């Protein structure tokens, strides 16, 4: 959810320990400006890089935070530590980023949402599951990022 991801960005940005880079397509510029506009260390790169430039930058990251998306897989293939957020899908369905620790896969609450995974591809969202990602607390995400970065530095 947008409000919870904004809280993650704020928590990470205010430490001034990190530079946050937001990746996206040109049609996502406005959506990503929502996260970066009031933050000192957060930069919206949507629409500013060629694909080759984006790959080069991803390959040099210390960590990639991503939903279950293509960027998680790209980063993992470059050996970048990847923390992923999972809604109605589950990494055991076969879409976990390559060679990443399961501890870096932050899952929606499967007790509260026992039908997860609702489909292999996440296309099916049962009634009442629309907010399942709200069970992944912003502080949990920040704590995991801090733990991973502390381990690799």
Model segments located where?
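Donor-binding and catalytic core of enzymes assembling or modifying cell-surface/extracellular glycoconjugates
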Residues: 2-88
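General structural signal for secondary-structure boundaries
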Residues: 1-2, 137
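Nucleotide-sugar donor-binding patch of glycosyltransferase catalytic domains
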Residues: 44-45, 76-152
């Amino acid at each position: 959810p947008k409000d919870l991801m904004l809280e993650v960005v704020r928590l990470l940005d205010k430490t001034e320990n990190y530079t946050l880079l937001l990746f996206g397509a040109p049609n996502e510029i406005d959506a990503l400006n929502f996260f970066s506009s009031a933050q000192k260390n957060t930069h919206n790169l949507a629409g500013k890089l060629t694909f080759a430039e984006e790959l080069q930058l991803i390959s040099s990251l210390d960590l990639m935070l991503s939903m279950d998306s293509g960027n998680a897989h790209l980063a993992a293939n470059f050996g970048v530590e990847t923390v992923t957020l999972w809604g109605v899908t589950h990494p055991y369905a076969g879409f976990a980023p390559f060679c990443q620790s399961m501890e870096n896969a932050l899952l929606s609450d499967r007790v509260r949402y026992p039908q997860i995974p609702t489909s292999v591809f996440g296309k099916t969202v049962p009634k009442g599951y629309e907010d399942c990602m709200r069970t992944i607390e912003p502080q949990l995400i920040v704590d995991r990022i801090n733990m991973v970065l502390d381990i690799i530095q």
